[in-house]
Amino acid sequence: MIILNATKFCIATFLSNLGDVIYSVVIAWYIADVLQSGFLMGAVLFSLGLSRFIAGLLCGPVIDRIGAKLFLWLSDMIRAIIVLVLAILLWDHTISFVILIMVSVLFGAIDAFYWSASESIKPRLVATEYLSRLNSQYFTVVRTTIILGPLIAAWMVESISIEHSLIAISILYVFSTFLILFIDSKNSHLENMNDNNDKTSYFSDLRLGFSFLNRQKMIFYLVITMFFVNIGANGVNVLFPFLAKNVSGDAKYLGYIYSSMSMGSLLTGLIFSVKSIHKVELKIIYLSFLLQATGIAALCFTQNFLIILIFVFVIGLITGFIGVLIPTFVQRSVPIHLLGRVNSIMMAISMLSTPVAQFIFGVSVDYFNIKYLFFIAGALGIVTSLSSLLINERKGTPRETVM
């Protein structure tokens, strides 16, 4: 039953995330091809990111009170309805600026609830010793959709029109909700909550999540470290197109770079899908950040494309390892009745680094040599991870909380 629950969760995640990726590509193409507005593209991305950040800070107490499974189901069902309505509107009309912004705000908020609920439900599906495997399977599923989604979206737009593509996306969300319904809920969150939660207000629950992070300094330092390291790690995604252009001027080389990164991440995910990590320490996480940042900085020292691909593949391997370590550490260290609050706050702060990185490195490309920017991105991660390592060694690694 435990394996079956985890399997249904991973398949539902695959369907839901595949719908997300295809939707993002389809809407981006619609804006570029039909509306032809760079301003609208920027406004849609900004509203999506802003609403995701705000909802991420606020959604935790609600997930902890009502339960992660319900929010997974609601998130996919609401998205299915929204996308279907967009498809209907497109039959005879052009989607207006206001509607696209409203949908972006809704999708951003729903994403925050969905991803926080996904992280919160995992400890209820498998025993603690199998958490790293489930996190690896989850990571592998998400990375796979990121690879397949754009290819499927491109085929859909060319072959069956945007309207039919949106209907297909809606069907993916519906299938996901169907699987979520059949996840066994006898170990649901409501049975693991503190009795006092029913007597507290939403705002006191929200403060409890922030106060927990404030008390658990090592987890708080991890969140801050993630923010700054991710600025460098996300920044390289802005730099990769310019790197490919400098090396060859051929667009296919950019595809090779992204494929190399994805293959590294997938390999790590596959390895730890069958091999459990029994002990996760902050020291290992920070060392992984350090190796990742060193690999990024090393890209400034070579123009040989084969060596670049090897470095990028290794960076992908380490990124995949980090993607398994962090959720496993948090799930083992945070009491189960606080997971929604802590995960939502961590997600919001971590995701904030993406637009910051895109802005900083996007603007910097016009003024600095690309190899210096890779060095700066890596140096930021190196300094941050080394500082966190020193703080961790001085204060000692926190013990994992037994749930």
Label for each model-derived stretch:
Residues 81, 85-103, 279:
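Short, flexible, glycine-rich and Lys/Arg-enriched loop motifs at helix boundaries
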Residues 97-102, 108, 133-191, 255, ...:
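Hydrophobic alpha-helical transmembrane segments
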